[in-house]
Structure formats: structure tokens, C-alpha cells
UniProtKB/Swiss-Prot annotation:
Involved in the N-glycan catabolism by catalyzing the reversible phosphorolysis of beta-1,4-D-mannosyl-N-acetyl-D-glucosamine (ManGlcNAc) in a sequential mechanism to yield N-acetyl-D-glucosamine (GlcNAc) and alpha-D-mannose 1-phosphate. It can also use beta-1,4-D-mannosyl-N-acetyl-D-glucosamine-N,N-diacetylchitobiose (ManGlcNAc2) and N,N-diacetylchitobiose (GlcNAc2) as substrates. It comes from Bacteroides thetaiotaomicron (strain ATCC 29148 / DSM 2079 / JCM 5827 / CCUG 10774 / NCTC 10582 / VPI-5482 / E50). The keyword Zinc-finger does not apply. This is 1,4-beta-mannosyl-N-acetylglucosamine phosphorylase. It is an enzyme of class 2 (transferase). It catalyses: 4-O-beta-D-mannopyranosyl-N-acetyl-D-glucosamine + phosphate = alpha-D-mannose 1-phosphate + N-acetyl-D-glucosamine. Optimum pH is 5.5. Homotetramer. One of its GO terms (molecular function) is glycosyltransferase activity.
Length: 322
């Protein structure tokens, strides 16, 4: 992949936050394509001389599916009007009740896509593509029930690695982050607990459930992971974004984890929508010094936030609950 310029906007004058929102948010509105009721919780990666993405688009019947999109600058997007049509050796794998919350990463020679796949309940679907035109679906990673499958962008000790959040069949009122390994992207094992919810009130914004967000990327300190945390309030679930640093060689070991959230729902498009009070990270573009994070806002639109990687690392270490 070619190294390209990530989307970027400097910190506003007077802003002291570690991360800040794009001034023109939302980047993608709910009616970006004719059929959509909402577009959110979507994945973006560098591709050729621009960017490609896999987008969660719920239609006006609120059927959940994933669509491809392309952009020159990571801000202005051309999203397909039709969902991805997968190819698979086992045709049963193509049938699903829903597909949502995709993540995408490049590993070695192809792009890998994961998503929440409705196969007798929520599990993690896996597919690969070389060109974002043809997609080849593999076996589901796990039995139901599981969500938030996030692959590491390189093998660890010769094996693929994936974060996930085992759950139940409903709108999960619990959940911790686990890691699993695979020699071939088909058979998964060596399951280890990575992060658990925090006890109330030590870090209450993440005391109900947590889940991996964007694909982690390697820094001098270890793997930097953005994740979501949830608290149950009188007004329902509230989703915010935090960060953690995982050991480079043994990512089941958490070195640092934020006590305070990086971004919580505060802007109107995060507070109001189909599911109010949600900031849900799904993708991060970085150039070694800076990062642009794409997140779902109120389960309705896509927002973007920026930050300097070293400042985020410093914040993660300074506020760590570990």
C-alpha cells in the first residue's frame, strides 16, 4: 500500500482536549445514499491513491448490511448503492440475517474484513478482498454469540490475532474483550481475556461493557487500541471512546488503559439520533505522528476526530487505571 496523506484538521484555538472533532462533522450523513436510514460504525483504510471503506448502511426498513465506498481525501465519499455480494465456497455462509459494524485491515497481501454476522445469532464474519470489488467470505470465526471482531494488522508469533467481545443474543448488557489466535484464519483458539469492565465507580464510563474499536496500530510503546466503553444510565446506555496500550509481543497483556474517556457524546449529532449518546470508534488512519479516528455517532452518522499519537499515548499512561 502506498503511504498517503491522512485527513487532518489542526486543533482549534483554545482547545485543550487530547482529541478534537472535525469541524465539518458528520463526515457522512444518514441519507448519503438513496436507500439509507443511517450510515455509521464503518471502516476505512488507505487504498491506491486514496481510501476505501466498508460502511454499515441500515436501509429504511432498518435492514442492516455493509457497502463499499471510495474517497480521494477520506472526507468526501462515493458509497455504493448496493450491499456487498460475497462469494463463498460454502454457500450457507453467505446467508445471514444481518451484517453490521465492519472493520478492515491489510495483512500481508490482502484486505481482511470482519463484521457482526447474523448466523443464528450474532457472530463474527470474515472475508477478504484484493480490490474492494470481489469479496470472498470465509467461515465465521466463532460460535454465536460474539461481536466487535478486530484483527491485528500483522501476525503475532506467526499467527493471526483477533480481538472480540463474547456476548449474548440481545442488546448485550455485559461484555469484556478477549483475544484469539489462528494459524489460517479458519480455526481459532488460545482464547485469552484482555480487558474487563471496570468496577463502579473507579471508571464508570466503562463499567457496563467494553469492545475493541479500530484496528490497533504499533507504536514504540506497544499496540495502541481505541475502544468503546459503556455505562448504563437512567437514559439507557452511554458509549464513549477510550484508549489502551497492549504489549507488542503478548497483546493479551494490557500495559496502560485510560481511566478517563478520550471522547464522549457531547456534540448534537452524538446526543441525538436513532440511538442517542453514542461515540463508537471503528477505524483509525495514522501517519506515525497523527491519527484520524472514524466513529459512529448516535447509531446514525459517521464522525471523525483527530489527535497526535504521542499526546494520546501520554494521556493513556498518565490516566491509566493499571
Amino acid at each position: 500500500m502506498n503511504k498517503i496523506q491522512i485527513p487532518w484538521e489542526e486543533r482549534p484555538v483554545g482547545c485543550t482536549d487530547v482529541m478534537w472533532r472535525y469541524s465539518q462533522n458528520p463526515v457522512i450523513g444518514r441519507y448519503h445514499i438513496p436507500s439509507s436510514n443511517s450510515i455509521f460504525n464503518s471502516a476505512v483504510v488507505p487504498f491506491k491513491d486514496g481510501f476505501a471503506g466498508v460502511f454499515r448502511c441500515d436501509n429504511k426498513a432498518v435492514q442492516m448490511n455493509i457497502f463499499t465506498g471510495f474517497s480521494k481525501d477520506g472526507i468526501h465519499w462515493d458509497i455504493s448503492h448496493e450491499p456487498i455480494q460475497f462469494k463463498a465456497g460454502n454457500t450457507e455462509m453467505i446467508e445471514s440475517e444481518y451484517k453490521y459494524d465492519p472493520r478492515v485491515t491489510w495483512i500481508e497481501d490482502r484486505y481482511w474484513v470482519t463484521w457482526c454476522n447474523g448466523y443464528h445469532g450474532p457472530t463474527i464474519g470474515i472475508a477478504y478482498t484484493f480490490d474492494f470489488v470481489d469479496f470472498f467470505q470465509c467461515e465465521n470465526a466463532f460460535l454465536p454469540f460474539n461481536r466487535n471482531g478486530v484483527l491485528f494488522p500483522q501476525k503475532i508469533d506467526g499467527k493471526y490475532a483477533m480481538l472480540s467481545r463474547p456476548s449474548d443474543n440481545g442488546h448485550t448488557p455485559f461484555g469484556d474483550i478477549y483475544i484469539s489466535y489462528s494459524p489460517d484464519m479458519k480455526y481459532w483458539g488460545e482464547h485469552r481475556c484482555v480487558m474487563k469492565v471496570t468496577p463502579f465507580p473507579e471508571s464508570a464510563w466503562q463499567c457496563t461493557k467494553i469492545g475493541a474499536g479500530s484496528v490497533p496500530f504499533l507504536t514504540d510503546e506497544g499496540w495502541l487500541l481505541f475502544y468503546h466503553g459503556v455505562i448504563t444510565t437512567c437514559n439507557g446506555f452511554r458509549y464513549a471512546m477510550g484508549s489502551a496500550i497492549l504489549d507488542k509481543d503478548h497483546p493479551e497483556k494490557v500495559l496502560y488503559r485510560t481511566r478517563e474517556y478520550l471522547i464522549g457524546p457531547a456534540a448534537p449529532y452524538e446526543l441525538q439520533g436513532d440511538v442517542p449518546n453514542v461515540v463508537f470508534p471503528c477505524a483509525a488512519l495514522q501517519d506515525g505522528e497523527r491519527v484520524a479516528v472514524y466513529y459512529g455517532a448516535a447509531d446514525t452518522v459517521v464522525g471523525m476526530a483527530f489527535g497526535y499519537i504521542q499526546e494520546i499515548i501520554d494521556f493513556t499512561k498518565r490516566t491509566s487505571i493499571i
